[in-house]
């Protein structure tokens, strides 16, 4: 059995999937709070930038992977309109349920599907835009997930990855203090779950940096891959096109 990382811990691949599932079952009901704590509220601006870059048109087909509470899904559904097709998907049943209920509460009726990004149940060449926000770093086989995202994108379609990344060097010390000291404390204080928040901080550090992820997307067959550093590299939006 192959080994992989769960935060800073080395575990069996099948064990990682179970541990990640446990984290997100635990944080699902407080996921928006978690995002606020992890990003100091900036996740809204990062998502708004991603939505603008996606430029979804009326009638567009969009796949939102690891869609969680549905922030991107909601915006894409509005942009695609009644003639569009926007899928809200997640591998975690708790996250999917919370997101589906919140979308319905906001009057957004769009399909929600429990699925694994490494084995997407969609045909080739189907979507105009495929997005994953703050989900890729939790996947065991990132290369497989990226290849699947490319597969289901139409020729000319785009794959977009919004993810925590490598912060600029002058900010690193302060960012480490926040990630490994402040964040678990906040997780314990507000969500009674310091361990899950500690894992999330560790998973960010183990995630590929901007240039490495760019290379991985190119190796998955995507072209014209570029990235935008946001908030000093705390987050990066990578965009690749399928030609």
From Swiss-Prot:
This is Ubiquinone/menaquinone biosynthesis C-methyltransferase UbiE. It catalyses: a 2-demethylmenaquinol + S-adenosyl-L-methionine = a menaquinol + S-adenosyl-L-homocysteine + H(+); a 2-methoxy-6-(all-trans-polyprenyl)benzene-1,4-diol + S-adenosyl-L-methionine = a 5-methoxy-2-methyl-3-(all-trans-polyprenyl)benzene-1,4-diol + S-adenosyl-L-homocysteine + H(+). InterPro entries: SAM-dependent_MTases_sf, UbiE/COQ5_MeTrFase, UbiE/COQ5_MeTrFase_CS. It comes from Burkholderia mallei (strain ATCC 23344). The lineage of its organism: Bacteria, Pseudomonadati, Pseudomonadota, Betaproteobacteria, Burkholderiales. Belongs to the class I-like SAM-binding methyltransferase superfamily. MenG/UbiE family. The keyword Protease does not apply. Keywords: Menaquinone biosynthesis, Methyltransferase, S-adenosyl-L-methionine, Transferase, Ubiquinone biosynthesis. GO terms for biological process: aerobic respiration; menaquinone biosynthetic process; methylation. The gene is ubiE. Pfam families: Ubie_methyltran.
